[in-house]
UniProtKB/Swiss-Prot annotation:
Enzyme class: translocase
Keywords: ATP synthesis, ATP-binding, Cell inner membrane, Cell membrane, CF(1), Hydrogen ion transport, Ion transport, Membrane, Nucleotide-binding, Translocase, Transport
Annotated protein name in UniProt: ATP synthase subunit alpha
Alphabetized Pfam families for the sequence: ATP-synt_ab (PF00006), ATP-synt_ab_C (PF00306), ATP-synt_ab_N (PF02874)
Gene Ontology cellular component annotations, sorted alphabetically: plasma membrane; proton-transporting ATP synthase complex
Alphabetized GO MF terms: ADP binding; ATP binding; proton-transporting ATP synthase activity, rotational mechanism
Bilayer disposition of the protein: Peripheral membrane protein
Ribosomal protein among keywords: no
Amino acid sequence: MQLNPAEISDLIKAKIENLSVNAEVRTRGTVISVTDGIVRIHGLSDAMQGEMLEFPGNTFGLAMNLERDSVGAVVLGEYEHIKEGDTVTCTGRILEVPVGRELVGRVVDALGRPIDGKGPINTTLTAPIEKIAPGVIARKSVDQPMQTGLKAIDSMVPVGRGQRELIIGDRQTGKTAVALDAIVNQKGTGVICIYVAIGQKASSIANVVRKLEEHGAMEHTIVVAATASEAAALQYIAPYSGCTMGEFFRDRGEDALIVYDDLSKQAVAYRQISLLLRRPPGREAYPGDVFYLHSRLLERAARVNEHEVEKLTNGEVKGKTGSLTALPIIETQAGDVSAFVPTNVISITDGQIFLETDLFNAGIRPAINAGISVSRVGGAAQTKVIKKLGGGIRLALAQYRELAAFSQFASDLDEATRKQLEHGEVVTELMKQKQFSTLNTAEMALTLWAINNGSYSDVPVAKALAFESEFLSFVRTQHPEVLEAVNASGAMSDESEKTLEAAMKSFKSSYAYQA
């Protein structure tokens, strides 16, 4: 076979002309050192703050310290296989997590990967974990209730949609129980719930998931878990991941509720990362930006107006407001609310529910201290009937606590003081509620109505809860229309009150409640 040199040169020219040279420009660096999940990298001159970095073995990290001649990064997950001299590549992307309806009912890790053994999650959308909170113009005032189903909270420290209400207390005071009741109570309301577990034992998280499944709450809940055995970096980013998942619903004109359990452990994880990155320590060895750590997270919980929702959905959703309500949890040490992290979060949130060990041990559960628990914006969002009937509850409890302290020293009490003490005892007893036995608006209104009109004046304190339960059952069977009317209108008419007065008289004549 004879080869023609001209043909060969033409072929080579054609190949050169058709050659596509699309060079992928990605900055590469070299690992200098690896210690405790912190990697120092040389040569990443173009790295961004918070950028995802790719390590060998399909491992990712987060660029956190951008120094003159090196980058300090934190590894998201296992780091044992990373060694000195390994090549690190910039991805050019900020850390993103999957978002969407497909996540509802699933348990995922801090990066949105499923860990419940139910197969992959087929989401098409992702969103960055760090976002700027809605501005002043984009927001709408909080005026819709987020019912928790707990008498003590909904009557004294009401929570509104788009509010941030802190749950604070020592270990083992029922903080998680209050949050789980709030999640269970959203069943059938269309509110999507996100439960973020930070630094808890895997067995505790499994227990929470099991309880939510038992009460049919997993159907509207996403669980984001960063267990105690996982890297500090994952515990640090878990709340931001959960918040991004909640914002997906908020920005589409829906309502979402997010529980951070708990932010004390996130602050500890962040302190660990910061100290390993050699950032200067401040008070209690926390870094200087620990306030910003929580403020930028909690400011993202808000109620956004119709225009903002319309803008975010490109006109798909019109005339609807969206909200993300946050229930952050903080664990105190020996009731010290003046420590660094508790005071920070108290100042960021719109009120706090303070749970006390002494009340919990005395059997008053939820163990809410009515004196220092407040809701700064929830009053405007309270249901009309609960606002009207529950106004005297906080006052009755506060006066009772004060008088109870004095009555220990006084041997003879006048009639008015004795009556006030008895009333306070009954109110304290009726504010008790078992876990997962939430009440709707009408059932709560019924109890508050009975307290206000003196129906419990002749009921022994020990029998008050049984009396309440029996009377509720009596009204449910004999006068269901009253409960339906209150639930529908959010108010109690004079006609309903007359019906209830007659029902109470009839019930008392047939029910043996006296001691």
